[in-house]
């Protein structure tokens, strides 16, 4: 049975950058990795409501200063009135960190939300949770991406589609999505939709362009 590589991990160092940037010695590594995992797990729980597309974690050489860059399609909702939402987020994230860590959060706006695989996956999940037919939800996301002149997009939905007794997977692709071409700038994201029939899995592949070396 054929096994598929992760589209982003496959391209690290070529078209993709690491989402965590820090260095640690042998004794520190496991603890810092756990901190990153706790931060990402918490932010994932609020990502759908706040349209969070990406989270990047940067640390200084001593690993006592953390810079958290959050990319979102709706920065106003995340920041809140007079920064109240951002202050709440800062306090909640600090709960997962030792007392000696200094945390800074930067909220960055995603300029083209229809060119982000994570936000498109959130859109499909939101539609499915509103009990809209899965093909209609996929088509709407495809059309929004095509208006941004992407080279290709593929969306797959898996589970008890439209309440069917037997779970299955269906996908629709428009244009090219060359997963084996390393120079292809592929964006990839997954999301879950909680429906009355169970959980539906959503995958989005977005082929933006080919990055050619000079």
UniProtKB/Swiss-Prot annotation:
GO molecular function, one term: rRNA binding
Residue ranges of every copy of the KH type-2 domain listed in the record: 39-111
Subcellular location as annotated: Plastid, Chloroplast
A single cellular component GO annotation: chloroplast
GO BP terms: translation
CDD domains: KH-II_30S_S3
Annotated InterPro entries: KH_dom-like_a/b (IPR015946), KH_dom_type_2 (IPR004044), KH_sf_prok-type (IPR009019), Ribosomal_S3_C_sf (IPR036419), Ribosomal_uS3_bac-typ (IPR005704), Ribosomal_uS3_C (IPR001351), Ribosomal_uS3_CS (IPR018280)
Keyword Chloroplast belongs to the record: yes
Keywords: Chloroplast, Plastid, Ribonucleoprotein, Ribosomal protein, RNA-binding, rRNA-binding
Domain of life: Eukaryota
Pfam families: KH_2 (PF07650), Ribosomal_S3_C (PF00189)
Family recorded in the similarity comment: Belongs to the universal ribosomal protein uS3 family.
Assembly behavior: Part of the 30S ribosomal subunit.
Name of the protein this chain belongs to: Small ribosomal subunit protein uS3c
Organism of this sequence: Phaeodactylum tricornutum (strain CCAP 1055/1)
Record lineage: Eukaryota, Sar, Stramenopiles, Ochrophyta, Bacillariophyta
């Amino acid at each position: 049975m054929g096994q598929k590589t992760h589209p982003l991990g496959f391209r690290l160092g070529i078209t993709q950058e690491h989402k965590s940037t820090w260095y640690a010695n042998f004794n520190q590594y496991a603890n810092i990795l756990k901190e990153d995992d706790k931060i990402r797990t918490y932010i994932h729980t609020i990502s759908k409501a706040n349209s969070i597309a990406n989270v990047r974690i940067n640390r200084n050489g001593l690993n006592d200063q953390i810079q958290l860059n959050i990319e979102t399609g709706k920065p106003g909702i995340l920041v809140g009135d007079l920064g109240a939402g951002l202050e709440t987020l800062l306090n909640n994230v600090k709960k997962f960190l030792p007392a000696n860590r200094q945390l800074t959060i930067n909220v960055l706006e995603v300029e083209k939300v229809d060119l982000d695989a994570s936000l498109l996956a959130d859109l499909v999940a939101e539609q499915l949770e509103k009990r809209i037919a899965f093909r209609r939800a996929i088509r709407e996301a495809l059309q929004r991406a095509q208006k941004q002149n992407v080279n290709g997009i593929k969306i797959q939905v898996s589970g008890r589609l439209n309440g069917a007794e037997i779970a299955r997977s269906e996908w629709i692709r428009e244009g090219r999505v060359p997963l084996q071409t390393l120079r292809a700038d592929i964006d990839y994201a997954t999301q879950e939709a909680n429906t009355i029939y169970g959980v539906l899995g959503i995958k989005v592949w977005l082929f933006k362009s080919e990055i050619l070396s000079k």
